[in-house]
Amino acid sequence: MRILGDFLMHYGVPGMKWGVRRKTETLFVSGSSKTQDPLSGYYRRKLPRKIRKELKYAIRGGQRIIVGDAPGIDRQTQDYLRKKHYSNVIVYGPGKQVRYSADKKWKTRPIDAPEYKEGSKRWLAKKDIAMTNDATRGLAIVLDEGAKATRHNVSRLQRQHKNVKVYELSKYGKRKDRWW
């Protein structure tokens, strides 16, 4: 995978812009459950501008967006999509029912994992694995160094040869926007 200006050359898709995609694509939004800005210490009330821009591209393209039901980035993404009156959204949640869906008209997909203890990391990871399998590309938002689940989602998408764009805000003051 190489980046050439704004264009991505990845697994036989030369010159395709990140924001210009087909309607058949599914964007998996993954992020930290903590929304505290490591630089200022304040809690973010809305998504960073770059993330909103990426979501606007997906909305314009009519892509399906899949997002989790956890607090933090998942909830902020859902609130943003509801504010934009976007309907092509599927909310995934662990267990027998989804914990939070910003719009009752959106489809929901509960992922039950009775073989694992409820609330355990493996129980939660089952939902992330299903989302990774259903996505054609990913957008990951890392706001703290401890976002292990988000990093696992990025590596799962990479192993399946799917494009992932990572927005990282580290506690060392460096805002990064990069491909992994």
What positions do the PLM features span?
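Charge-dense, intrinsically disordered terminal/linker segments
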Residues: 1-25, 178
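Acidic/glycine-enriched connector segments
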Residues: 31-178
